[in-house]
Amino acid sequence: MALLCYNRGCGQRFDPETNSDDACTYHPGVPVFHDALKGWSCCKRRTTDFSDFLSIVGCTKGRHNSEKPPEPVKPEVKTTEKKELSELKPKFQEHIIQAPKPVEAIKRPSPDEPMTNLELKISASLKQALDKLKLSSGNEENKKEEDSDEIKIGTSCKNGGCSKTYQGPQSLEEVCVYHSGVPIFHEGMKYWSCCRRKTSDFNTFLAQEGCTTGKHMWTKKDAGKKVVPCRHDWHQTGGEVTISVYAKNSLPELSQVVANSTLLNVHIVFEGEKEFHQNVKLWGVIDVKRSYVTMTATKIEITMRKAEPMQWASLELPAAKTEEKQKEETTE
């Protein structure tokens, strides 16, 4: 029976009887994410593309490992006896205070409202970085391996969550099981936007089986600019919600962020030839006129002013049950 290898960067299935000391190629280090760059602590290679990060070949040989790494242990909280707790409680007189009347919730506007371009604020660091790139771009041109139509043996599939490698023409006929969404890292949790199976352990996240079937993508042949995923997260205060997209050297003249009260469409062009797209059906209602975008050399921050001061349960509004059923019927 084939077992799944849990060594970082491997994810292959293996036969325990044929397992040898050099059967597995893996990363002994840990994943490192810094300023939109992704890599392994044991290797020097860095990339901004998450699918390229997943396809970085391991730097160490060893035996396959079938033992699943344990989930992070939560600290045990010990409580004292009820008597001791009651003695520690401060003694005071009760005063009943009438709570203020709740603020009437704003009625959710129609998603068909016209979209408005959010104001772009460009930082000095981004202006300096773009000026340097313009000076150097006229002297250097790098040829990439992806420009070639030839697929080399051992090339990793570029689909998210797929760990298969190209072994010859027969690989073109294989069914690819992958994640059609993008990776999301938020408040210590890691998951794919397409299936939302959340985990706090990075190895478990990498080992999650895909939720979509299709054909392997051995090369990226996007004409012109390439649409790529970007690491992004969000946070909120009482009056604002902020989305951070970690894309370096974004181009203000080619980028656009539009929104209405309940929808947000993000289109960012960065590093000359890469594009990031994201459409968000917002959980709450925003004030478009008081919302704006700040573009720096390392990231883009979308600051949205809340129409009412309330805590958002999530960034995106969950799909209605009728919409989910329609999606399931179309996928089947």
UniProtKB/Swiss-Prot annotation:
Residues 62-82 are annotated as: Disordered. Residues 64-82 have a biased composition (Basic and acidic residues). Keywords: Acetylation, Chaperone, Metal-binding, Phosphoprotein, Repeat, Stress response, Zinc. Disulfide bonds: none annotated. The modification Phosphothreonine is found at residue 47. Gene3D superfamilies: 2.60.40.790, 4.10.1130.20. One of its GO terms (biological process) is regulation of cellular response to heat. Residues 227-316 form the CS domain. Residues 65-316 are annotated as: Interaction with HSP90AA1 and HSP90AB1. Zn(2+) 2 binds at residues 27, 42-43, 59. GO terms for molecular function: ADP binding; ATP binding; Hsp90 protein binding; zinc ion binding. Coiled coil: none annotated. It holds the Pfam family CHORD. Residues 5-64, 157-216 form the CHORD domain. Regulates centrosome duplication, probably by inhibiting the kinase activity of ROCK2. Proposed to act as co-chaperone for HSP90. May play a role in the regulation of NOD1 via a HSP90 chaperone complex. In vitro, has intrinsic chaperone activity. This function may be achieved by inhibiting association of ROCK2 with NPM1. Plays a role in ensuring the localization of the tyrosine kinase receptor EGFR to the plasma membrane, and thus ensures the subsequent regulation of EGFR activity and EGF-induced actin cytoskeleton remodeling. Involved in stress response. Prevents tumorigenesis. Interacts with HSP90AA1, HSP90AB1, PPP5C, ROCK1 and ROCK2. This is Cysteine and histidine-rich domain-containing protein 1. It comes from Bos taurus.
